[in-house]
Amino acid sequence: MQLKTPKDLAIKARKMGKKTVSYSQFSRYKNCPKSWKLAYIDKETSFDPSIFLIFGTAFHETMQTYLDTMYKESIVAAEKLDVNNILLTSMRTEYAKVVEECGQDFSDPKQLAEFYQDGVEIMSWFKKNRGAYFAKKNTELVGIEMPILHTTESNENVMLMGFLDIVMKEHDKIKIYDIKTSTRGWKAAQKSQNGDQLRLYKKFFAKQYHVDE
C-alpha cells in the first residue's frame, strides 16, 4: 500500500490496531485543549475551503517538482520546466477538487489570479536564489512527501503521522525542509511554531528511518 495521504496513514495504523495523531492535532491541543476536543472528539467543526489552502498545496507541488527534477536529472532540466504552468494547472486542479467536495465556489477569478501571480514571483525569486538554499555538490535528495508513521513514547497505541515535504542528505547529514507560504510574513511566534513541527518530525524520522537524531 502506497502511503500518499493522511487517510492512507490512518488506515495502515488501524490495521495495526492503533490510532493516529497529526502535528496539527498536537498543536491545536497545545494551544487550546477545548478547541481540540470540539474538533476531534465532538466533531463540531466543519471544513472551510480556503484559497490559502489551494495556493499552498499547488505551490508545494510546483517547488517539489522543480527540486525533484533538479536532483534526479539536472539543474538545466529543472530550469527548463514551465513552473508557471505547473503552478497554474495545480491551482486549477486543487480548486476544482475542493469545489466538488464542498459543493460551491469559494473564490473568484480575480483572487485566483492574484495568488497565481504571487506564486509566479515567488518561484522567480527562488530560481534566482536557489543556490543559497539547495546545492547539488555533496547533496542528495532523499525523498519528497516522505511518510512518518511511528508509535509515540507516551502511548504505544497511538502513532504520530505526517509527511515531510523535502528530505535532503548533505555531507552525510539529514536535513528536513517544511515548505510554508504566508501573505503576512513570519513573526517570531510563527517561526517558533514551525520549529516545534520540524523538531517533532526530526525525532520521529530518526526513529522510523534509523538515522541519528
Language-model segments: which ranges?
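Long, acidic, intrinsically disordered low-complexity segments
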Residues: 1-21
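Hydrophobic (often cysteine-bearing) scaffold residues that line and stabilize catalytic clefts
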Residues: 51, 55, 115, 194-197
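Short, solvent-exposed segments of well-ordered alpha helices
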Residues: 20, 46, 50-53, 188-192
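Nuclease catalytic cores
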Residues: 26-72, 120, 145
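Mg2+/Mn2+-dependent nuclease catalytic core
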Residues: 139-213
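Short amphipathic alpha-helical segments and their helix-coil junctions
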Residues: 15, 33-46, 98-103, 176, ...
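An acidic intrinsically disordered interaction segment
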Residues: 17-31, 158-169
